[in-house]
Design a protein with these regions (language model features):
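Conserved glycine-rich
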Residues: 263-265
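Short conserved segment of the HATPase_c
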Residues: 223-235
Length: 290
């Protein structure tokens, strides 16, 4: 209400306005604001769910692999324990069989010790605490030493073991000579174990522009292509001739981890009925080592 002059007096003027449209606009703005808030909250929840899922996925995968690893390890440990228990029971019943049963128990204990060592190595690798030395390694000496170590075993199994290296010295690499020897030991042990008598295993090497390529080839039954894709998986063993009580399916996994620690690559280069070839490539430092 407003007062306005009118002659000698005053008059009141009242202005009326319909605010229904304004109220409608206010409610529309409130609704739009509430919708935007709800949409923002929904988007925030979706983003949190997405990022949380991505963050949790590696943890879930790690837990799944750990559960599978423990289950497989338990299964592998159960086998030698069963043999030891059976041998111990038989020893109580028939003492005359003591020498044979004692050897059986000793062999199974040795198997368990190897398995535990392998499990500890992989556990250190998973924890990121597995380290290797960083020193110059004479590849020629490493190959010769490894071949000489396996030559008696090859002869015992009726196999030929060949060492093929170039006439000139191979370049030296940096790493842990003991661990590199362990990789070659795994490859040669597999090759000698799965190659039938009369076959041949070859340990070879060649120099590449920036690397040294080591090769282990055998004339065994080969690895089916379906199995080759999983050959480095832990506890994986093909259901073919490449299966042995002496092997737990961990050797190649350990060799792969050691290769990674040396910044190299390990792969199955060739498989088939004519045999299998594993190739280990190690980088050569740009500056020559002495």
């Amino acid at each position: 209400m407003t007062l306005i002059p009118a002659g000698r007096g005053w008059q009141s003027l009242v202005l009326l306005k319909d605010i229904a449209d304004s109220r409608r606009e206010i409610w529309l703005l409130r609704g739009a604001f509430a919708g935007l808030v709800a949409l923002g909250v929904a988007a925030l929840v979706a983003l949190c769910w997405l990022f949380a899922g991505r963050a949790i996925r590696p943890i879930e995968e790690s837990q799944r692999r750990q559960a599978e690893f423990i289950a497989a390890a338990s299964h592998e440990l159960r086998s030698p324990l069963a043999v030891i228990r059976t041998a111990a029971s038989a020893l109580a019943v028939d003492p005359a069989q003591a020498p044979r049963l004692r050897r059986s128990i000793e062999n199974e204990c040795a198997r368990m010790a190897r398995l535990v060592d392998d499990l500890l190595s992989l556990a250190r690798s998973d924890a990121g605490t597995w380290s290797v030395a960083d020193a110059p390694v004479d590849v020629d000496a490493l190959l010769l030493e490894t071949a000489e170590k396996f030559l008696p075993l090859a002869r015992e199994r009726g196999l030929s073991l060949h060492l093929e290296v170039p006439d000139t010295d191979l370049p030296m690499v940096r790493g842990d000579a003991q661990r590199l020897g362990q990789i070659l030991t795994v490859l040669l042990d597999n090759a000698l174990s799965y190659t039938p008598a009369g076959g041949a295993v070859t340990l070879g090497a060649q120099a590449l522009p920036e690397a040294v390529l080591l090769r282990v080839a055998d004339t065994g039954p080969g690895i089916p292509s379906a199995d080759a894709a999983h050959i480095f998986d832990r506890f994986y063993r093909a259901d073919t001739a490449r299966n042995s009580k002496e092997h737990f399916g961990l050797g190649l996994s350990i060799a792969q981890e050691l290769t990674r620690l040396h910044h190299g690559t390990l792969r199955v280069a060739s498989t088939g009925p004519e045999g299998t070839v594993f190739e280990l490539k190690l980088p050569v430092p740009k500056e020559p080592l002495s």
